[in-house]
Swiss-Prot record:
Substrate binds at M50, G198. It comes from the Bacteria. It comes from Salmonella paratyphi A (strain AKU_12601). The keyword Transmembrane helix does not apply. Pathway: Cofactor biosynthesis; thiamine diphosphate biosynthesis; 4-methyl-5-(2-phosphoethyl)-thiazole from 5-(2-hydroxyethyl)-4-methylthiazole: step 1/1. One of its GO terms (biological process) is thiamine diphosphate biosynthetic process. Its cofactor is Mg(2+). Catalyzes the phosphorylation of the hydroxyl group of 4-methyl-5-beta-hydroxyethylthiazole (THZ). This is Hydroxyethylthiazole kinase. Disulfide bonds: none annotated. NCBIfam families: PRK09355.1, thiM. The gene is thiM. CDD domains: THZ_kinase.
Length: 265
């Protein structure tokens, strides 16, 4: 199943602005996905920067167009750097996005993520288990893996969006993007996207970058989800497995032409 025509039309419009702006996206992400995240942003036309030292993270967050905080490989020193960057982004009105990886499993990162929410992220992106845990409705999951369907976490996402006044994305076979008042659903993608490390983390970076665009934040974030779903489908069609999927996915993002996809579907 592909994203519907309305979503793809919206995504085509947003992608033009995204590539024209090439948002400078400050990624404080986990060690496992640094390269894949940077390459995903580059393939779409953004400008990634992986600045992680506390001395540099604070001033850089103020000049970037967007900031991503991904707690996948959180340490005490990295938490200090992330907090400094978020405080700087908050003061500079730089939109920042939280990816609360495995927040329902480990207490240190759960408390850290909850503490950061007071600094008003523009967006939160997680799987169902992570969103349920962050909203205080359940604890669990299997590390980075979800034990819940995305739809089951939609009420939690809507409550969290209302509480924080932000966009919340719950990802799965169907992605749900909500600001509590409106909710958009984006089907598509391919199961191969779950057989490599980093597609969710990379999506969070693209969501962060999309928050730098003018216009309706909900539509911009939904467009980011649509781009990734379309690229995942295209890559799967010419891949034999996870090893060939990764380069095919980056190529699909680079060559993504949503208008052409709209014309042929």
């Amino acid at each position: 199943m592909q994203p519907d025509l309305h979503c793809r039309t919206l995504a085509a419009h947003t992608l033009k602005h995204f590539r024209a702006l090439s948002p400078l996206t400050h990624c404080m992400t986990n060690d496992v996905v640094q390269t894949f995240t940077a390459n995903t942003l580059l393939a779409l036309g953004a400008s990634p920067a992986m600045v992680i030292d506390p001395v540099e993270a604070r001033p850089f967050a103020a000049i970037a167009n967007a900031l991503l905080i991904n707690v996948g490989t959180l340490t005490a020193s990295r938490a200090d750097a992330m907090r400094a960057a978020v405080e700087s982004a908050y003061d500079a009105k730089t939109p920042w996005t939280l990816d609360p990886v495995a927040v329902g499993v480990l207490e240190f990162r759960r408390r850290f993520c909850l503490d950061l929410l007071s600094l008003r992220p523009a967006a939160i992106r997680g799987n169902a288990s992570e969103i349920l845990a962050l909203a205080g409705m359940a604890l669990g999951g299997r590390g980075v893996d979800t034990t819940e369907a995305a739809l089951a976490a939609l009420p939690a996402a809507q409550a969290l969006a209302r509480q924080i006044d932000c966009i919340v994305v719950v990802t799965g076979e169907i992605d749900y993007v909500t600001n509590s008042q409106r909710t958009l659903s984006i089907p598509g993608g391919d199961p191969l996207m779950t057989r490599i490390v980093g597609t969710g983390c990379a999506l969070s970076a693209v969501v962060a970058a999309s928050c730098a665009l003018p216009g309706a934040a909900l539509d911009n974030v939904a467009s980011a989800c649509c781009w990734m779903k379309l690229a995942g489908q295209a890559a799967a069609e010419r891949s034999e497995g996870p090893g060939s999927f990764i380069p095919a996915f980056l190529d699909a993002l680079y060559h993504l032409d949503v208008e052409a996809a709209n014309a042929t579907n």
